[in-house]
Amino acid sequence: MDARDIIRRPIITEASMAQTERKRYVFEVDTRATKPEIKKAIEEIFDVQVSGLNTANVRGKKKRQGRYVGYTRKLKKATVTLSKDSKDIQIFNEG
């Protein structure tokens, strides 16, 4: 997989923005991606040094439309910790 296919989008919430001060960033990643692939993709795209990586598989929520039941899509979140001497990721610092 290409690095741009692994990293889908940044997850920008109040909780994730509070972690940026400690150089921790949260991304939605491809569900098939492994930790080494995610680390390599982050380092390649943003030109940073990753010191830690945690992942979480989030299952889809049950949603109803009348009597029909379906599920939202499942996703995988990756929390990336950068090294002390690494620069910040600019996506999270913009307005």
UniProtKB/Swiss-Prot annotation:
The keyword Ribosomal protein applies. Belongs to the universal ribosomal protein uL23 family. SUPFAM superfamilies: Ribosomal proteins S24e, L23 and L15e. The keyword rRNA-binding applies. The lineage of its organism: Bacteria, Bacillati, Bacillota, Bacilli, Lactobacillales. This is Large ribosomal subunit protein uL23. Part of the 50S ribosomal subunit. Contacts protein L29, and trigger factor when it is bound to the ribosome. GO terms for biological process: translation. InterPro entries: Nucleotide-bd_a/b_plait_sf (IPR012677), Ribosomal_uL23-like (IPR013025), Ribosomal_uL23/eL15/eS24_sf (IPR012678), Ribosomal_uL23_CS (IPR001014). NCBIfam families: PRK05738.2-4. One of its GO terms (cellular component) is ribonucleoprotein complex. Keywords: Ribonucleoprotein, Ribosomal protein, RNA-binding, rRNA-binding. One of the early assembly proteins it binds 23S rRNA. One of the proteins that surrounds the polypeptide exit tunnel on the outside of the ribosome. Forms the main docking site for trigger factor binding to the ribosome. GO terms for molecular function: rRNA binding; structural constituent of ribosome. It comes from the Bacteria. It comes from Leuconostoc citreum (strain KM20).
